[in-house]
Every structure is written in C-alpha cells, then in structure tokens.
C-alpha cells in the first residue's frame, strides 16, 4: 500500500506542476479564458507544504521539466521553473545527506549559461544560490526572514520594509481588509527568533533534531538569550557559506551549531541517535506598513524613516568600517558632494554646506543585502552610473582560524600615503567649508520653497532663498526626523546608484507596492519623477534604501455601495484597525468613478508571462475568493509557528519576495501653454486625452453638475481646428516629421503596444488617435452633428496647437484630478532624467538631433516583475 500511496502523491504533485506551467508560452493568447489560473501556483504550494517529504518530490519533477526545457529549447518555461525551484528549496525543511538534488540542479543550470540574457543571468544567480545552500543549509531562508523582520546581527544589518499604498475610495473593501491584516504585527520578536533557530537547527541536523523539545526549550529562554544564540548561529552560517569546500563547510557548520546548542543548554536535543520527524516551518509574514495614498508624490515614504530609524541609525559598525572612518576622518568636510543624481555639482555643494551642522556626522551604516537568486536588479537600468570596484566584503574564516583583528585591506596603506600627499588647496577648501558651516544656524528648520504643507499659523518670516532647503517635501515631517538622518552623507560614504544594478550589497530594501488601475500608474510615474528630483539635491531615502516598485492591478471600484472597512482618509497615517465606513464618491458629492483601463498591467503581462499568471490574473477572480483561507485546517504541531493568511495575502508576499527584475516603462512629459501665456510641465505614462474626450471626463467627474451640463458624444461635439506636428521614429534612430491641420473632436495619445505581436524593445512609441470630422451637418430643425473618422498613427513626439488660440482641455492618465482647461498648445515628448530635464523642449521639435547620451538618459519607471522583459 505504501508504494501506491507514494505514486499517487507523485502524480498529484506532477499534475499540479503541469497546471502551473500550462499556457505560459508567448504564443498563449489563443485561450479565451484565464480565470483561476492564478491559483495554480498557490495550490501547488499548499499541496506540497502538507508534508515535508513532498518538497523533495517536487524538486525532482522540476529538474526533470528543466532538462526537457533544455532539450526542446522552450525558453519561456525556464524562468518559471527556476522560480519554482528557488521557492521550493527555500521552504524545504532538510536535505538528507545522501540526497544529490542540489548537485544535479547545479549541473542542470550550468548548461544554461550559454543561453541569452536574461536566461543566463537567472541561471548564474541560481548557481550562486545553490552553492550557498550546499555549504550552509537554510541560509537563504535565514537571510530573507532576517531582512524582512529587521533583526540586526552585528555586521549583517540589512532590512527589508514593505509599504502598501492604496486609495480606499477606489479599492474594494476586501483588498483593504487584506492589506490591514498584512500590516497588523504578527509574531513577536521572541517568536521570530524561535522560528529562525528552529529552522537553522532542523536544516542542519534534519530528523536527528528533536524539534518539539527544542521548541519548548527556546520558549523558556528570554529574548536576550535568544538573541545571543541567534547571533552565534547566524555568524556560523555566514562563515560556512564562504568556505571553499562543500563537505568541509557542512561539517564545520554542524560542529559549530552543536557547540552553540551545548552552550545554550540543549543536551540530547541536537544530533540525537534515533531520527524523529521533520516539520514544515513556513516563512513568517513580512513587516508591512499600509497607507492611504492618492497623491502625486512619495512624501509619505519618509515616514518609514521614522519607524525604521532604530535599524538605520549608526551604532553598530564592523571592524573594517571603523577603520575606514578613522582613515577618512580628515576628509569629512572637504570636497563637494558628488551626488549620483545631482544635476549640478554647484547646487549639490551649496545644499550640503547649508544643511551640515558641526554636530552632524554620519558613520557608514552597516547593512547586508539579501544575496539570493532574486536579489539583484537586471542590467540596463536608467541610472547611467558606474562605480569603482572595491573589495568590501568580509571574507569568511576557515574552520579553526582565529577572528581577524586589525586587518586592513591591501589598498588602505596606499590610501594613507595618498592622503598625506594631498595638496594644501584641499586644506584651504576644508577651512572654508568649516567657516561657512559655522555661519549657518543649526536650529533653522528645513523648509521647501512654496510648500503647501507649511503651517499657516507660523509667525516667523520665511528665510531667504539661499537658506531654504529644497530637499524635503514636508516641513512638519522634517522637524521629526533626527539630526543624524538629515545630515548630508560624509564624503567617505560609498555612493550608490539610484535604482540600479550596482546597488550597495549592504543596502536595505524598501518595497513600494501600489494597487490600482492606469490612473494610479500615472500617479506613480509623477511621484517617481519628483522623488528623483528631490533625491538629486539631497538624498534621504536613497541613502538608506534600495527602492523597488511593485504594481498590483485592481478593477476600479465605483463606490456605489457602502463597504465595511477601516476608515481614515489621512494621507499620512496607516490605516487603522477599526471597522467603519469609507465615504464613496457619491457621499462626497461626486459622480461614481468612470472605469479606468489596466493597459499598463497587461503590457507587463505580455513581457513577463509569470507576472500575467500570478499578479494580473488576480484581477479576474472575485474578491471574496481571494480573501478565503486554506480549506485545510492548520495541522502544524508547533504553536505560533505561522499565521494563516488569505490567498491574496500569500500571492502578494510571493510577488514581493520573488519578483526581482524590473521592466522599464517609458515616462512622457507634456508642456502645456494656456490662454494666459503661462506654461507648465506635466508627467504621464499611459494616456493623454485632449479635446472632447477630456471634457467628457471632466463633466462625468463634476458630480451633480453633470446633469446640468449633459454629455454629448463625438458626433455632437463642437469640432476643433488643430495644427498637429508629429515625429515618427524608425529603427535606425532617425525621425520623420509631419505637419498637418485637422478638424477634430478628440485627440488621444496612449502607449502603442497593445498586442503581443507589437512587442519591440527598440521601438518605444505612442499611438496618436485622431477623431477627425469629415463633414459637419447643421440642419435648421435639429442639433448639428458630425460625420467622423478615426485614424491611428504611431509617434514618438507630437505638438498640438489650437488654431487662432482655440482653447481645449487635457486629461492625463484618465485622472479626473489632472484635467487642465484653457490649453492652447500641447507638446509631448519622452521624459528625461533630472540630469537632462533642463534641456528646452523646443529643441526636440525644431531639429530632432539625438545623441547616444540623450537616448541613455530617458526616464523610465521600473516595475518589478519575475523575469523582466523576455526576448
């Protein structure tokens, strides 16, 4: 009976795996239905987690599928299989000593190194991940949980914070309830330490570790004792992962952990003679903060600094970092800040001198990035920054070796001689910097010029422009941040690219998860552009966090029925736990929201099939299904080991943990000229509506006024005479300009790629939709109407001018709050990074002379996906 049961289990797991991979090829668009496919991955994880032995069965079948992929050359399945293998190894309780699964996996993925990018990059990271697991079993699990829970361990101080941003008026109540549950504190620090120690000992000793007895022993310990045991365990694992020989590393780690257990008072629990039973230890829920967000800025993210300042503040330094600080103490005030995003070194230098006080000093923060398969960002990010290579990693000790004391890197002696030979001009510059610094009042509050968040009852006069700080978006929040956080980084701090693949390996990670439709994606693009501009002049968030943006599409709620969910419309406070009612648009005197598209998420799904399956597919299921928990009761014997979450919460955490490759979405800018002659520049990412379509959206959003104004379609709209100048890009990089005059009711711009066959990474374009009036009929007895025709043109730049200064309306990204009236001129072009933002827009319309540097400086919004843009 036992072999039959095993065969049945293998068949069930194999069937669940095939369902996960079904329809993932790029030619998969023939299927007219997709509802329920997003649950296949969750169902597979649920099935495997019921028994610790199921993980090894699934890993065997994943490797068999991967070998078939290599033989058949089916590129599309490699990334999903690698992700499934990684997540399964992460949750596997223990690999038996006689198991060769990881060695077979290393041999299998080594054969894919000759495949094109990103497949070779995925396999290279898989090999690094497998090597670490072979030497120190369970180390990837430890690193992930340690970072997500914010547990500092001496030199390993990396932290991962997840922030959920959603608009409660537009998102369904079920999504709000799930977000509120994720942001509710789960395990206590005592419980987290216990879980990590249980996992570490079981991963090393396997069934020979009496886990229930060890659990009771750990629960009787104080949190200080658990922290000491956890610190020794972590140091041992990190050192073992750096040993060259796999067998030597595993044996040394086993001996070291056994010594740690004996020291902690665990006799007869570790390495028992008779094997017991393995237990599945799920990953604890990550720390999450939930905020109500409906702004065009990420000012709210700075509240994370207030919550995480205990982890970010200086205090625990490694030996090498303390020596570097001593070596470079004499350089603390010399040389201007060369910010990685600065538009001008002079502006950056001035802002540094104004904000530095004599007491402000910031040692290098000690952090370590999660070095796993999903750790790095892909190549080709929009940073354009390359930093000098430098040996900055701590080499692990060999077994039996003494702890390194006073060791310095080989280049430090040369650096000391270099500092002694510096010219006296830098000493003069340093004295000048100190004199300027001493002249600044350290108690002067930081304010942004013209900030709308400034208190109205402040009687003090605004400081002069030279004394204002343009670094922080909110004055109130600025006064709450500690002085060490606001101080400019010292000269010796290693510069870190902004959202780049060259991130500092010790940086903490800030996951920003945004829920919404294309309207919200436009807000994300505008907030991202402002964030880059602010971080250019005075980096705050990017000094401590590596930013990652995640996008979860949802259907826009019409708000026609009251929903029971937490109530707080504050933009600067997390959603509370009390159950009240959010006001709907009707309660606010507004019309119900008009439907918004989800073209951005569909575009991401075309580029990454695993994103389409596991993230975009959530939109096709009813919210009540996504909020259900597992039908199987939790039978885990360890109390408090994990908290059961709804399906939606599990999928959100899966997306945040395993999506590590960004897709770059081109951001566009439009310069608008009004009837009064004033000009303004706005940002959009998906669509721009002009004329009757924008006016109609404004009328629908006007609340009670929509009944009085009425809504006409394009056949009854008043036509506009427009001069349209557009540029059609070519693969060669040349542009062909056209100038025409049209009588139109509406002119719309949207992202060109709507079908899989239109995917082409070398051609980023917009679709110009012209609703042209062919003939206007004005009968005497009835209202006039138009005979219209619609044409589509792919463009990369366009200029629209109202004839005889005829005004029109413009709407950005289907946002009712971004409708601008009385516009007479609209110029649209790709948006550049802040370094290129000073270029006059007219240059792009006069002579389309483009250089390679301009093409590299385009501003793109990076949205995290699982595999990035597949070729």
Swiss-Prot record:
N-acetylmethionine modified-residue sites: 1
Keyword Acetylation set for record: yes
Localization: Nucleus; Cytoplasm; Cell membrane
Disordered: region residues: 381-413
Xref: Pfam families: PI3K_1B_p101
Modified residues (Phosphoserine): 451, 500
Span list, region Heterodimerization: 25-101
PANTHER family, per database record: PHOSPHATIDYLINOSITOL 3-KINASE REGULATORY SUBUNIT (PTHR15593), PHOSPHOINOSITIDE 3-KINASE REGULATORY SUBUNIT 5 (PTHR15593:SF2)
Self-association state and partner proteins as the record states: Heterodimer of a catalytic subunit (PIK3CG/p120) and a regulatory (PIK3R5a/p101) subunit. Interacts with beta-gamma G protein dimers.
Comment on protein domains: The heterodimerization region allows the binding to the catalytic subunit.
Name of the protein in its database record: Phosphoinositide 3-kinase regulatory subunit 5
């Amino acid at each position: 009976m036992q072999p039959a049961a095993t065969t049945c289990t293998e068949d069930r797991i194999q069937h669940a795996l095939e369902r996960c991979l079904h329809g993932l090829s790029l030619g998969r668009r023939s299927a007219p239905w997709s509802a329920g496919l997003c649950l296949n991955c969750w169902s597979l994880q649920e099935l495997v987690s019921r028994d610790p032995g199921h993980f090894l069965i699934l890993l065997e079948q994943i490797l068999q599928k991967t070998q078939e992929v290599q033989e058949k050359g089916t590129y599309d399945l490699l990334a999903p299989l690698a992700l499934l293998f990684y997540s399964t190894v992460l949750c596997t309780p223990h690999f038996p000593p006689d198991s060769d699964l990881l060695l077979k996996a290393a041999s299998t993925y080594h054969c894919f190194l000759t495949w094109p990018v990103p497949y070779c990059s995925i396999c290279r990271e898989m090999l690094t991940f497998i090597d670490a697991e072979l030497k120190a079993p369970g180390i990837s699990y430890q690193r992930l949980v340690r970072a997500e829970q914010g547990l500092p361990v001496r030199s390993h101080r990396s932290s991962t914070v997840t922030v959920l941003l959603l608009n409660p008026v537009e998102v369904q109540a079920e999504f709000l309830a799930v977000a509120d549950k994720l942001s509710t504190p789960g395990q206590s620090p005592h419980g987290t330490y216990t879980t990590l120690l249980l996992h570490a000992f079981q991963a090393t000793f396997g069934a020979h570790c009496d886990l229930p007895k060890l659990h009771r022993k750990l629960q009787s310990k104080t949190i200080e004792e658990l922290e000491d045991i956890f610190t020794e365990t972590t140091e041992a694992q990190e050192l073992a992962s750096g040993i060259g020989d796999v067998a030597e590393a595993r044996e040394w780690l086993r001996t070291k952990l056994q010594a740690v257990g004996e020291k902690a008072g665990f006799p007869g629990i570790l390495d028992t003679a008779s094997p017991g039973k393995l237990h599945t230890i799920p990953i604890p829920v990550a720390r999450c903060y939930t905020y109500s967000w409906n702004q065009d800025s990420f000012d709210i993210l700075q509240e994370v600094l207030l919550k995480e300042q205990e982890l970010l503040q200086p205090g625990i330094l490694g030996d090498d970092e303390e020596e570097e600080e001593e070596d470079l103490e004499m350089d603390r005030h010399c040389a201007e800040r060369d910010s990685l995003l600065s538009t001008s070194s002079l502006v950056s230098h001035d802002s540094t001198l104004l904000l530095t006080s004599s007491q402000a000093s910031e040692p290098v923060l000690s952090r370590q990035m999660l070095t796993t398969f999903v750790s790095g960002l892909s190549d080709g990010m929009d940073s354009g920054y390359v930093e000098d290579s430098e040996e900055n990693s701590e080499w692990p000790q060999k077994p039996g070796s003494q702890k390194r004391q006073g060791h310095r890197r080989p280049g430090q002696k040369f650096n000391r001689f270099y500092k002694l030979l510096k010219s006296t001009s830098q000493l003069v510059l340093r004295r000048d910097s100190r004199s300027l610094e001493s002249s600044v009042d350290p108690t002067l509050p930081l304010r942004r010029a013209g900030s709308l968040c400034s208190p109205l009852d402040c009687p003090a006069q605004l400081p002069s422009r030279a004394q204002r700080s343009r670094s922080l978006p909110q004055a109130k929040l600025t006064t709450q941040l500690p002085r060490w956080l606001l101080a400019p980084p010292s000269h010796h701090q290693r510069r870190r690219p902004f959202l780049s693949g060259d991130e500092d390996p010790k940086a903490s990670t800030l996951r920003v998860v945004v829920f919404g439709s294309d309207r919200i994606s436009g807000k994300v693009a505008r907030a991202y552009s402002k964030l880059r501009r602010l971080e250019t002049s005075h980096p705050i968030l990017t000094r401590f966090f590596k930013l990652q943006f995640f996008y979860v599409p949802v259907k826009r709620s019409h708000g026609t029925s009251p929903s029971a969910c937490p109530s707080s419309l504050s933009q600067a406070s997390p959603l509370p736990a009390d159950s009240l009612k959010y006001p709907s648009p009707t309660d606010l005197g507004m019309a119900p929201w008009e439907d918004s598209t989800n073209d951005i998420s569909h575009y991401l799904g075309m580029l990454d099939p695993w994103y389409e399956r596991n993230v975009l597919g959530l939109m096709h299921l009813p919210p009540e299904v996504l909020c259900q928990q597992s039908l199987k009761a939790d039978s885990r014997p360890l109390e408090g080991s994990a908290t059961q979450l709804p399906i939606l919460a599990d999928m959100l955490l899966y997306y945040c943990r395993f999506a590590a490759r960004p897709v770059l979405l081109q951001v566009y800018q439009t310069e608008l000229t009004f009837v009064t002659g004033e000009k303004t520049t706005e940002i959009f990412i998906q669509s721009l509506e002009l004329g009757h379509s924008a006016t109609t959206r404004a009328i629908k959003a006007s609340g009670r006024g929509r009944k009085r104004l009425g809504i006409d379609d394009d056949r009854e709209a008043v036509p506009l005479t427009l001069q349209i100048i557009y540029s059609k890009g070519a693969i060669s990089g040349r542009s062909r300009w056209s100038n025409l005059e049209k009588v139109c009711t509406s002119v719309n711009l949207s992202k060109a790629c709507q079908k899989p066959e239109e995917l082409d990474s070398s051609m980023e374009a917009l679709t110009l939709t012209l609703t042209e009036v062919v003939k206007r009929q004005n009968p005497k007895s009835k209202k006039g109407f138009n005979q219209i025709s619609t044409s589509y043109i792919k463009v990369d730049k366009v200029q629209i001018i109202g004839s005889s200064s005829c005004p029109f309306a413009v709407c950005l990204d289907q946002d009712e709050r971004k409708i601008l009236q009385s516009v007479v001129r609209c110029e649209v072009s790709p948006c550049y990074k802040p370094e290129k933002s000073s270029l006059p827009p007219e240059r792009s319309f006069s002579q389309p002379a483009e250089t390679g540097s301009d093409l590299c400086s385009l501003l793109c919004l990076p949205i995290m996906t699982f595999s990035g843009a597949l070729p």
